[in-house]
Protein backbone atom coordinates (compact mmCIF):
# COMPACT_ATOMS: atom_id res chain seq x y z
CA UNK A 1 0.00 0.00 0.00
CA UNK A 2 2.80 2.43 0.89
CA UNK A 3 4.57 1.71 -2.39
CA UNK A 4 1.39 2.41 -4.34
CA UNK A 5 0.92 5.66 -2.43
CA UNK A 6 4.46 6.70 -3.34
CA UNK A 7 3.88 5.78 -6.99
CA UNK A 8 0.64 7.76 -6.91
CA UNK A 9 2.56 10.74 -5.60
CA UNK A 10 5.05 10.31 -8.45
CA UNK A 11 2.17 10.16 -10.94
CA UNK A 12 0.69 13.40 -9.60
CA UNK A 13 4.05 15.14 -9.91
CA UNK A 14 4.46 13.69 -13.41
CA UNK A 15 1.11 15.14 -14.51
CA UNK A 16 2.05 18.50 -13.03
CA UNK A 17 5.41 18.44 -14.81
CA UNK A 18 3.68 17.73 -18.14
CA UNK A 19 1.26 20.63 -17.60
CA UNK A 20 4.13 22.96 -16.66
CA UNK A 21 6.10 21.87 -19.74
CA UNK A 22 3.25 21.96 -22.28
CA UNK A 23 1.79 25.29 -21.17
CA UNK A 24 5.18 26.83 -20.41
CA UNK A 25 3.94 27.96 -16.99
CA UNK A 26 7.39 28.24 -15.47
CA UNK A 27 11.10 28.26 -16.14
CA UNK A 28 12.72 25.02 -17.39
CA UNK A 29 14.46 24.70 -14.02
CA UNK A 30 11.05 24.32 -12.32
CA UNK A 31 10.14 21.63 -14.85
CA UNK A 32 13.41 19.81 -14.15
CA UNK A 33 12.83 20.13 -10.40
CA UNK A 34 9.32 18.66 -10.61
CA UNK A 35 10.59 15.90 -12.92
CA UNK A 36 13.35 15.23 -10.40
CA UNK A 37 10.70 14.82 -7.70
CA UNK A 38 8.96 12.25 -9.91
CA UNK A 39 12.20 10.30 -10.10
CA UNK A 40 12.78 10.60 -6.35
CA UNK A 41 9.32 9.22 -5.57
CA UNK A 42 9.84 6.34 -8.01
CA UNK A 43 13.22 5.65 -6.41
CA UNK A 44 11.59 5.54 -2.97
CA UNK A 45 8.75 3.31 -4.20
CA UNK A 46 11.08 0.66 -5.64
CA UNK A 47 12.40 -0.79 -2.34
CA UNK A 48 9.04 -0.32 -0.64
CA UNK A 49 7.15 -2.30 -3.29
CA UNK A 50 9.77 -4.78 -4.51
CA UNK A 51 12.34 -7.10 -2.94
CA UNK A 52 16.02 -7.85 -3.26
CA UNK A 53 17.35 -8.26 -6.75
CA UNK A 54 14.58 -6.25 -8.39
CA UNK A 55 15.58 -3.20 -6.36
CA UNK A 56 19.18 -3.52 -7.52
CA UNK A 57 18.19 -3.88 -11.16
CA UNK A 58 15.84 -0.89 -11.11
CA UNK A 59 18.30 1.35 -9.27
CA UNK A 60 21.15 0.47 -11.64
CA UNK A 61 18.98 1.06 -14.71
CA UNK A 62 17.56 4.26 -13.26
CA UNK A 63 21.08 5.54 -12.50
CA UNK A 64 22.11 4.81 -16.10
CA UNK A 65 19.04 6.57 -17.48
CA UNK A 66 19.52 9.63 -15.27
CA UNK A 67 23.22 9.84 -16.10
CA UNK A 68 22.48 9.56 -19.82
CA UNK A 69 19.78 12.26 -19.68
CA UNK A 70 22.01 14.50 -17.58
CA UNK A 71 25.00 14.14 -19.88
CA UNK A 72 23.27 14.17 -23.28
CA UNK A 73 20.72 16.90 -22.53
CA UNK A 74 23.19 18.85 -20.37
CA UNK A 75 20.82 18.85 -17.39
CA UNK A 76 23.22 18.80 -14.48
CA UNK A 77 20.60 17.98 -11.82
CA UNK A 78 19.89 14.59 -13.44
CA UNK A 79 23.56 13.70 -13.51
CA UNK A 80 23.81 14.68 -9.85
CA UNK A 81 20.76 12.50 -9.07
CA UNK A 82 22.42 9.53 -10.77
CA UNK A 83 25.43 9.48 -8.43
CA UNK A 84 23.55 8.56 -5.21
CA UNK A 85 21.61 5.96 -7.19
CA UNK A 86 24.88 4.39 -8.34
CA UNK A 87 25.97 4.14 -4.70
CA UNK A 88 22.58 2.68 -3.67
CA UNK A 89 22.72 0.13 -6.50
CA UNK A 90 26.24 -0.90 -5.49
CA UNK A 91 25.25 -1.36 -1.84
CA UNK A 92 22.17 -3.27 -2.95
CA UNK A 93 24.11 -5.69 -5.17
CA UNK A 94 26.48 -6.44 -2.29
CA UNK A 95 23.45 -7.26 -0.12
CA UNK A 96 22.06 -9.46 -2.91
CA UNK A 97 25.31 -11.38 -3.17
CA UNK A 98 25.40 -11.81 0.61
CA UNK A 99 21.88 -13.22 0.70
CA UNK A 100 22.65 -15.48 -2.28
CA UNK A 101 25.76 -16.85 -0.58
CA UNK A 102 23.79 -17.48 2.62
CA UNK A 103 20.99 -19.20 0.68
CA UNK A 104 23.32 -21.65 -1.04
CA UNK A 105 25.25 -22.72 2.03
CA UNK A 106 25.71 -26.31 3.28
CA UNK A 107 22.82 -25.92 5.74
CA UNK A 108 20.47 -25.60 2.76
CA UNK A 109 21.84 -28.44 0.62
CA UNK A 110 18.49 -28.94 -1.12
CA UNK A 111 18.59 -25.43 -2.59
CA UNK A 112 20.05 -25.56 -6.07
CA UNK A 113 20.23 -23.05 -8.87
CA UNK A 114 20.60 -23.33 -12.59
CA UNK A 115 24.03 -21.95 -13.52
CA UNK A 116 23.94 -18.70 -15.49
CA UNK A 117 20.12 -18.69 -15.77
CA UNK A 118 19.27 -17.45 -12.29
CA UNK A 119 18.12 -14.17 -10.76
CA UNK A 120 21.42 -13.47 -9.00
CA UNK A 121 23.51 -13.68 -12.16
CA UNK A 122 20.88 -11.76 -14.14
CA UNK A 123 21.01 -8.97 -11.55
CA UNK A 124 24.79 -8.86 -11.78
CA UNK A 125 24.73 -8.75 -15.59
CA UNK A 126 22.14 -5.96 -15.66
CA UNK A 127 24.18 -4.03 -13.09
CA UNK A 128 27.34 -4.51 -15.18
CA UNK A 129 25.48 -3.46 -18.33
CA UNK A 130 24.17 -0.30 -16.67
CA UNK A 131 27.59 0.66 -15.34
CA UNK A 132 29.24 -0.15 -18.69
CA UNK A 133 26.75 2.18 -20.36
CA UNK A 134 27.44 4.91 -17.78
CA UNK A 135 31.18 4.48 -18.31
CA UNK A 136 30.73 4.64 -22.09
CA UNK A 137 28.69 7.85 -21.90
CA UNK A 138 31.13 9.35 -19.39
CA UNK A 139 34.13 8.68 -21.65
CA UNK A 140 32.43 9.44 -24.96
CA UNK A 141 33.79 12.52 -26.76
CA UNK A 142 30.25 13.23 -28.02
CA UNK A 143 29.04 14.01 -24.49
CA UNK A 144 31.43 16.33 -22.74
CA UNK A 145 31.42 16.88 -19.01
CA UNK A 146 29.24 19.86 -18.02
CA UNK A 147 31.19 23.00 -17.14
CA UNK A 148 29.31 23.48 -13.87
CA UNK A 149 29.93 19.93 -12.64
CA UNK A 150 31.81 19.88 -9.35
CA UNK A 151 35.38 18.86 -10.26
CA UNK A 152 35.89 16.83 -7.06
CA UNK A 153 32.76 14.77 -7.65
CA UNK A 154 33.69 14.30 -11.31
CA UNK A 155 37.19 13.12 -10.40
CA UNK A 156 35.96 10.71 -7.71
CA UNK A 157 33.37 9.12 -9.99
CA UNK A 158 35.81 9.01 -12.93
CA UNK A 159 37.76 6.55 -10.80
CA UNK A 160 34.85 4.81 -9.02
CA UNK A 161 32.67 3.96 -12.01
CA UNK A 162 35.32 1.89 -13.86
CA UNK A 163 36.55 0.38 -10.57
CA UNK A 164 33.04 -0.74 -9.61
CA UNK A 165 32.46 -2.00 -13.15
CA UNK A 166 35.60 -4.15 -13.10
CA UNK A 167 35.02 -5.36 -9.53
CA UNK A 168 31.39 -6.30 -10.05
CA UNK A 169 32.14 -8.02 -13.36
CA UNK A 170 34.85 -10.11 -11.71
CA UNK A 171 32.76 -10.98 -8.67
CA UNK A 172 29.65 -11.80 -10.73
CA UNK A 173 31.50 -14.56 -12.59
CA UNK A 174 33.50 -15.61 -9.52
CA UNK A 175 30.30 -15.95 -7.51
CA UNK A 176 28.55 -17.90 -10.26
CA UNK A 177 31.45 -20.36 -10.59
CA UNK A 178 31.74 -20.69 -6.80
CA UNK A 179 28.03 -21.44 -6.35
CA UNK A 180 28.14 -24.04 -9.14
CA UNK A 181 31.06 -25.93 -7.60
CA UNK A 182 29.63 -25.60 -4.10
CA UNK A 183 26.42 -27.26 -5.29
CA UNK A 184 28.38 -30.19 -6.67
CA UNK A 185 30.77 -30.77 -3.77
CA UNK A 186 28.97 -29.54 -0.68
PLM regions with names:
Residues 1-186:
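Alpha-helical transmembrane segments of multi-pass membrane proteins
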